[in-house]
Amino acid sequence: PSTLSPAPCTLHKTRQDSPFRPGRRGGAIPAEENVIIPNIPDDKVEAILAEPLLKTYVPNPGPIMSGLVSCTGSQFCGLAIVETKANGVKLAKELEATMNIPNEVRMHWTGCPNTCGQVQVADVGFMGAMAKDAAGKPTPGVNVFLGGRIGHDSHLGEQITDKPVAIEGDLLPFVQNLLVEKFGASML
């Protein structure tokens, strides 16, 4: 059997020592808030991969999309300063389309300082804040955090921006440079 974990997700063969081995029931939603569907019979994998839902929640996401986490953002939260989900997905797609990124980079978005998106434990975290555009007008932006880790060598990431970076126009090149300098990425 195989295990499918969409949104962002990965499809892989189940090993004998896996907690998702045959005979085990149910799915799982791990801390990263992905969905894992275990025990898919091999003869059903292709049919499941053809499901319309998996056009949006792809089974083999790229190195940014696979580690993307977001709070609900301003779409559903009155405390959020910025829209997190749409901006996170847009940035992930732009980065993956313009860069060679050798390893997964966990990026977390949170719309406000309450940090429901847990930006301080991400490789790169984005906390919603108001920035200024090129004309000096207020625009949605983010404070950027770097270096958070969970697990054995856990520690909180640190804010690396002195002032918020405007999401439109400034954030993409800022993060591209960050990925080149800190994560071994290169431009395509």
Question: Can you describe what each PLM-predicted range is?
Answer:
Residues P1, Q120-M187:
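Mobile "lid/hinge" segments at catalytic clefts and subdomain interfaces of large enzymes
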Residues S2-T139:
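Small-residue-enriched alpha-helical segments and adjacent helix-cap loops
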